[in-house]
From Swiss-Prot:
Domain of life: Bacteria
Cell compartment(s), UniProt: Cell membrane
Organism: Staphylococcus epidermidis (strain ATCC 35984 / DSM 28319 / BCRC 17069 / CCUG 31568 / BM 3577 / RP62A)
Keywords: Antiport, Cell membrane, Hydrogen ion transport, Ion transport, Membrane, Sodium, Sodium transport, Transmembrane, Transmembrane helix, Transport
Annotated InterPro entries: Cation_antiport_E
Keyword Membrane included in the entry's annotation: yes
Positions of transmembrane segments: 1-21, 27-47, 60-80, 101-121
Membrane disposition: Multi-pass membrane protein
Protein's name in the database: Na(+)/H(+) antiporter subunit E1
A molecular function GO annotation: antiporter activity
Short name of any one Pfam family annotated for the protein: MNHE
Length: 159
């Protein structure tokens, strides 16, 4: 991925030198030409096309921000109710992530989401212990995490 970006920048700089025009517009045009060239050569270059990984990271950020906003409103709803009706609880989330950095990223995203805290990870790195401030059902909580956060974390790690 890094070599593809370096080649793209190199093509941009060469474009600036060949055209003898050192403007931002010309650099952007050279960058787009370099992007096209790297895309044509990405089967020969190591790794996947680097814009795919950048797109997946952007989707991870958007998904996390969406979950963050939904969780904030959920916690706000709990706080503003005159009666305490939430049912906090602990549950075990079994993950299919294989790499340590993916597991840590998922755990951090869960903890950063209001209303949930990761308490620990099992020794076999297949289970995450989570506390939720409003525990409706285990299946619903697990499906929520699996369909949103774990899905995009897994995609970022794919090659």
């Amino acid at each position: 991925m890094a070599i593809q970006f370096v080649i793209n920048l190199l093509v941009s700089v060469i474009w600036l030198l060949v055209t003898n025009s050192y403007t931002l517009n010309n650099f952007v045009l050279g960058f787009i030409l370099g992007l096209f060239l790297v895309y044509l050569l990405h089967r020969v270059l190591p790794g996947q096309f680097y814009l795919v990984r950048i797109y997946r990271i952007i989707m991870l950020i958007i998904t996390f921000l969406t979950e963050l906003i939904k969780a904030n409103f959920g916690v706000l709803k709990i706080i503003l109710k005159p009666r305490i009706e939430n049912k906090p609880g602990f549950f075990v989330y079994e993950t299919e992530l294989e790499r340590d950095w993916q597991l840590v990223l998922l755990s951090n995203l869960i903890t950063l989401t209001p209303g949930t805290v990761v308490l620990g990870i099992s020794d076999d790195r297949k289970k995450i212990y989570i506390h939720s401030i409003d525990f409706s059902t285990k299946e619903e909580e697990i499906q929520n995490i699996k369909s949103s956060l774990e899905k995009v974390v897994r995609k970022v790690g794919e090659k």
